[in-house]
Amino acid sequence: LGAAAAVGGGLLVLWAAVHYLFGGHFDALFVAMEAAHIVGMAVLIRKLGSERSCEGLSLRTQELTAGYLLLRLLASVFYEGNHHTLLDAASLAATGWVIQLMRHGQISKTYDAARDLSPKDSVKFLVLPCVVLGVLVNPGLTRVRGLLGFVTNSMWACSVYMEAIAVAPQLVMMRNIAEKKGYMERNSTAHYVFALGIARFLGCASWILQPRVLSYVFGQTRSFKLWGAFSLISELVQTLILADFCYYYIKSVVEGSLLVRFHSSV
């Protein structure tokens, strides 16, 4: 109960701070999405601190998360610089701290690298395709022109594509654990991934419900139409990737079970 009160109080403070700084001119669903993400990070940090273990946690997912947050943060300096930037900076700081603990902290010995995606495969199959796609299909905003404009547009697009697949290594790792045991415990790692799922649902709703989405998808120029279509696909892919896990997580809660059983588990 105390932890729930602390989280609730933290979210209230976050909401009040954003409202005060930006005078109420912000996307409520986006703030709720970032709040859910921060709650997930709080659960994760609590796990690392109290359990002194990062067992079942994917370092690749944390690195990809830090990567897309950093790219989006750098690009937003030129294009937004609003509450999005503030909330992304908070998420990046928390993610960076988790990575530091998993790599160099005392809990690094509990990291199961054998079940995680290798750094080489992460770069080859996840990062590079996002970079190439970001260069080829990006918003083409003209606020910043020349080489810097091309780079910032590519960074922004790359962050969108990378965000869509960042959680994939974590889900694969959890599947590997579930296949070995026949189930996965509904523990802190599961709570963290479920919070990401809630954040993703809110983020997708925020994106789709914005009035400018129709102009993205049905823009006047062919390149802008393409960017709008790829952005929408990225949002849907990321939501669908997490939907399967969230379904089985909610099912375990409804059934009163502490175990999450996937459809492929026995």
Question: Which stretches of residues belong to each language-model region?
Answer:
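Helix-boundary capping/turn motifs
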Residues: 7-10, 34-38, 63-66, 163-164
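Juxtamembrane membrane-interface segments at transmembrane-helix boundaries in membrane proteins
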Residues: 1, 15-23, 76-79, 144-152, ...
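Membrane-embedded alpha-helical segments in integral membrane proteins
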Residues: 9-22, 69-75, 171
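Hydrophobic, ordered structural segments
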Residues: 40-162, 173-179, 230-255
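Short, hydrophobic transmembrane alpha-helix segments
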Residues: 17-27, 49, 53
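Membrane-interface recognition of transmembrane alpha-helix starts
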Residues: 1-12, 22, 29-32, 123
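Coil-to-helix interface segments in alpha-helical RNA-associated scaffolds
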Residues: 37-40, 169
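C-terminal transmembrane module of eukaryotic multi-pass membrane proteins
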Residues: 165-169, 173-266
